[in-house]
Amino acid sequence: MTKPQPIPFGKSDLFSLGVEVELQIIHPETRNLFPISPDILEEWSLQSPHLKPEVFQSMLEIDTPICKNVQEVEYELLLTSRELLRICKKHGARLASNGTHPFAKWHHRIFYPSDRYEYLLERNQHIARRLMIYGLHVHLGMKDGDHCIAMMNEFLYYLPHMLAMSASSPFWTGHDTGLASSRITVFEAHPAGGTPCRVENWAQFEDIVQKLTRSNSIGSFKDIWWDIRPSPNYGTLEIRICDGVPGIRKTTRLVAFIHLLAKHLQKRLEQGIRRQTPDDWMVRENKWRASRHGLDCEVLIDNDGMTKNLREDIKDLLAAMKEDAAEMGYTEYLKQLVEEDLTHPSYEIQRALFEKTGSLEHVVDSLCDVFEKDLDVV
């Protein structure tokens, strides 16, 4: 058997942060998606190249440089978002950052001209055409490949927590899906997407990538779209399960939670305390429960099938991380997360507004308003 080809793991500072936010471009009159990303990209004026095209021309991605903490992440996202919104307004457009557009039709979308996207379309056909979804991706700097895999396994239990806290996609193509996150059901249809394979060390990850590549299942490890995955080029662990979160302030509160959780799990590893790695069935079941019921779900807490209310599990976790939060300057972020985000999740707000108005256009307006309010744009 051929020995797996080594995959170099990049250098990064431990728990450095990089954040990617996928955005919807909205037409202010129709409230539908607005395919003008080439025009916006042509006019981009900031020196830092932290605005990127995405698979459709009605979609853009903003990302941060490497940051030390959430305060830096917030500053960078606000800076980029304000400039982007200025250009969008010039072109008669608005922005939203939640997980799905409430009523747009995927078969009306226009692909961005790119060899990468043409490859995805040819390879994945219907699955690629439906990628009208918007996520939040968080990169965490790791020591090395083995450390990255160890942390990935520690994070597996908390995937439903992050999905439920971000869930913002109850509507899809004009219908109430009955889910808190419909985006994740579209995302996991990708042939190398969804729940990660069980991996114990970096050598096993290299072996999986080699076999997938040899069998022409993927072109490179970039085609592995797991909910959480190593990102060797950056030397990071990338968390990809989250829906896009409405507004930059709420986004940074969730990033603060994730960053704090990483440091909490690292302390436990150093103390020799490791949570039992959840079985594959448990990871999948918890993901489904969070997708369906959001923060109201009963999450499985062990491989024996014991359950606990997810909101309570999150609050207990926050209590355990209270001292670290104070040390990192994250106390106010987490206070607002509990008082606002855990109390009034986006999927509930959107549904309540639709029930009150009967208009998905009003839902779109409210999501754009949230994005602009966070930027102090009148």
From Swiss-Prot:
Function as written in the Swiss-Prot or TrEMBL entry: ATP-dependent carboxylate-amine ligase which exhibits weak glutamate--cysteine ligase activity.
Q: According to its UniProt record, which reaction does this protein catalyse?
A: L-cysteine + L-glutamate + ATP = gamma-L-glutamyl-L-cysteine + ADP + phosphate + H(+)
In the record, biological process GO terms are:
modified amino acid biosynthetic process
Alphabetically sorted, this entry's keywords are: ATP-binding, Ligase, Nucleotide-binding
Q: Name the coiled-coil region(s).
A: none
The record's section on Gene3D superfamilies has:
3.30.590.20
Q: Which NCBIfam families match?
A: gshA_cyan_rel (TIGR02050)
Single GO term (MF)? ATP binding
Name the record gives this protein: Putative glutamate--cysteine ligase 2
- A Pfam family of the record is GCS2
**InterPro entries cross-referenced by the UniProt entry:** GCL_type2/YbdK_subfam, GCS2, Gln_synth/guanido_kin_cat_dom, YbdK
* Similarity-based family: Belongs to the glutamate--cysteine ligase type 2 family. YbdK subfamily.
